Amino acid sequence: MGEKDGLDQMGTADRIGALRLESGLSELELANELGLTVDGYCDLEQQDSELESVLSIAQALKLAQLLGTNLLGLLGEAEQPLKVPIARVRSALAAQLGSSAEAKEALEDEIDWDVGPFLEGSDQWTSVYTIEFIKKLAMAIEVDWQIVLAGVSNQDVPPVAGISE
């Protein structure tokens, strides 16, 4: 079994810790790059749910890049699914909802998120939403969340002042 195979068998927190050690970066360096406190970063290496529920998509993409992987790799998904560009998901969802405020409200109630910034295609949408949002949205529209997440790329993330590229 190769080293990468071992990473696939770990929980998310342990995988992040192992990738950090492999990268040679310190907890402080990663915390600074992500705009977190050291304690906030350490939570990522201790709690499996932190990556999905606390970091914005932009922060998660940055972490994956710094650790030499992609979002699905951070989550331990060995199989790389098809990618559906997030713009296509957005336009299909907008078409499905049409101009119905009721349909939009029903979706928001179902996933417990405001979809406004996502539907508007705001440059900042990846700073507003988490991976947990992508999972809930994908489930609601009956699409594999991995396909949706694979369609989110660093091109969707606006540059953040103070974070090195």
Show where each model-derived region lies:
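Short, basic-rich loop-to-helix N-cap that marks the start of a DNA-contacting helix
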Residues: 48-65, 123-139
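Short C-terminal boundary/hinge segments that cap the last helix of small helical domains
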Residues: 65-82, 142-158
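Alpha-helical residues within the helix-turn-helix
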Residues: 21, 32, 65, 109, ...
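Mid-protein regulatory/catalytic core that forms ligand/cofactor-binding pockets
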Residues: 113-165
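A short, Lys/Arg-rich alpha-helix, primarily the initiator
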Residues: 1-22, 79-106, 146-150
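Residues that mark the N-terminal boundary/hinge immediately upstream of a DNA-recognition element
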Residues: 15, 26, 59, 70, ...
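Short alpha-helical DNA-recognition segment
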Residues: 24-46, 98-122
